[in-house]
Amino acid sequence: MQCPYCNADDTKVIDSRLAAEGAQVRRRRQCNQCQERFTTFEVVEVVMPRIIKSNGRIEPYDSQKLKRSIQLPLQKRPVTLDEQEAMISRIEKRIRQLGEREISSKGLGEVVMSELKELDDVAYVRFASVYRDFQDIEAFRQELQNIRPVDEQ
């Protein structure tokens, strides 16, 4: 690691500790040339799979696009921003755990739908109506039947 004070390449680690609840490693380093000390943080680089669109085009994963796509169906629903952020984290974790370099937009949509279904039924139906391109009231009825079986109605 290069020293930020004298730019020497010869530094040594004098202390290492976990930080940010185990998501980072904090290291105290000392330059062997100027003896200055400095702190570095080490984190895992997370690489998300690319998204294969329905037209075959491949795009990089965009967390902001995912966030926007779930904010719309959640408008005016009793879901906090913390709950939304937690859901986005779960979605991203599930996608990473697939271990694939690419995922179809359809596969991503299914993961989003399963998370929305757990979080808020109304938001789930709103998202499903756009994602599955409902054309008539019967499509809504079918989806509602999937959420709430006949014996619960």
Curated annotation (Swiss-Prot):
UniProt cofactor note: Binds 1 zinc ion.
DNA-binding keyword on record: yes
Domain ATP-cone: 49-139
Zn finger (unnamed) location: 3-34
Source superkingdom: Bacteria
Record flagged with keyword Glycoprotein: no
Gene Ontology terms, MF aspect: ATP binding; DNA binding; zinc ion binding
Essential cofactor(s): Zn(2+)
Keywords: ATP-binding, DNA-binding, Metal-binding, Nucleotide-binding, Repressor, Transcription, Transcription regulation, Zinc, Zinc-finger
GO biological process: negative regulation of DNA-templated transcription
NCBIfam families in alphabetical order: transcriptional regulator NrdR
Family: Belongs to the NrdR family.
Role: Negatively regulates transcription of bacterial ribonucleotide reductase nrd genes and operons by binding to NrdR-boxes.
Entry-linked HAMAP family: NrdR (MF_00440)
Protein name: Transcriptional repressor NrdR
